[in-house]
């Protein structure tokens, strides 16, 4: 039965067409193009407001070099949040549950921050490997630890995958055992399912935000 | 190359002119129960009345379930939960979000309106000021008259001063002449008195002097006698 529980995460194909491509690109139509009008309808106004506020907040700690990444980070955030939220609907496929997608986003972006840091300010970038104020005997060990911590940063992608997969799986399992259950016990399971739903909505938004936030943090260190 | 240029000239042109931009509708399409467009009910009303679309919906649902075109599985429960949360969220926070979006637009309009109002008030004020200036300019005749009066008064004052000055000067000269004349007369009088006195003094002969002294002595004696008589009496 374990295989059928994870069936929901199999990348769907239809007649040889990988439908994940559709799942990745179709949510784009949910975002209306900002029009040339001065006063817009509510959706475009809210969308513009949200994007402006988010970009402003995200770029606060970054210096001018990091501002080049504004479009990338904001569009990444919108992308992830849309995919996560849409995946909560029934019978939908969440592309961000695929490790390949998340690592494909995390590793190149993380590597870009590392390379930028090493290229533009190698001393400062290497200096991050040793925090200030460490006692002298600890220095060799700490450098090794910090290097490991640096290379484990692509776990950004793993974090996203794990959180979303776990959440979806929990919802699926709770709903599955709810199906043949007696009504009296079913009420408890329904409550569990309801709470899980609320959690998943929160997790979907938070995980997308955390992804982008950590990336901006890595950028801040290196740029 | 010529054909390409012809095509280039036709970029960004179209026979439809969109200016001025057509206005957006005020409100979105009307919906029944938040999801189903009102038009469906209007379309079915002539043939099936008010309950038509509901019967259609119920029948479709029953058909899909009974023919097992849609099977109730675990996703149904997950969908029910998610649906509850979504509907609750939209019903509770929908109006607030809409009000917020409207407020954003309102603020935008209000900022522009403020600029316009400020311009209007400043222009109206400018008109008022201009009118006042025109009214002031009408009174310029009075101003000129007043100024002319001032100048005339100054001239008059000046003339009178000069007249006084002349009068004083002439009076001074006449006074001088008078003083000169009185001086002359006084000197002549003094001189004459001195001459008369001198002549009188020189004309007093010694015998006249003796006679006058003798008279004085007799007079004194008489006076002494009288005085004596008064004291003894």
Curated annotation (Swiss-Prot), chain A:
Transmembrane feature ranges: 12-32, 69-89, 98-118, 132-152, 165-185, 197-219
Locations listed in the record: Mitochondrion inner membrane
Superkingdom classification of source: Eukaryota
InterPro entries named among the record's database cross-references: ATP_synth_F0_asu, ATP_synth_F0_asu_AS, ATP_synth_F0_asu_bact/mt, F0_ATP_A_sf
Listed Pfam families: ATP-synt_A (PF00119)
One GO BP annotation of this record: proton transmembrane transport
Keyword Oxidoreductase: no
Record's bilayer topology term: Multi-pass membrane protein
Coiled coil: none
The entry's keywords: ATP synthesis, CF(0), Hydrogen ion transport, Ion transport, Membrane, Mitochondrion, Mitochondrion inner membrane, Transmembrane, Transmembrane helix, Transport
Molecular function GO labels: proton channel activity; proton-transporting ATP synthase activity, rotational mechanism
Task of the protein: Subunit a, of the mitochondrial membrane ATP synthase complex (F(1)F(0) ATP synthase or Complex V) that produces ATP from ADP in the presence of a proton gradient across the membrane which is generated by electron transport complexes of the respiratory chain. ATP synthase complex consist of a soluble F(1) head domain - the catalytic core - and a membrane F(1) domain - the membrane proton channel. These two domains are linked by a central stalk rotating inside the F(1) region and a stationary peripheral stalk.
UniProt subunit comment: Component of the ATP synthase complex composed at least of ATP5F1A/subunit alpha, ATP5F1B/subunit beta, ATP5MC1/subunit c (homooctomer), MT-ATP6/subunit a, MT-ATP8/subunit 8, ATP5ME/subunit e, ATP5MF/subunit f, ATP5MG/subunit g, ATP5MK/subunit k, ATP5MJ/subunit j, ATP5F1C/subunit gamma, ATP5F1D/subunit delta, ATP5F1E/subunit epsilon, ATP5PF/subunit F6, ATP5PB/subunit b, ATP5PD/subunit d, ATP5PO/subunit OSCP.
Protein name: ATP synthase F(0) complex subunit a
Lineage of origin: Eukaryota, Metazoa, Chordata, Craniata, Vertebrata
Gene, per the UniProt record: mt-atp6
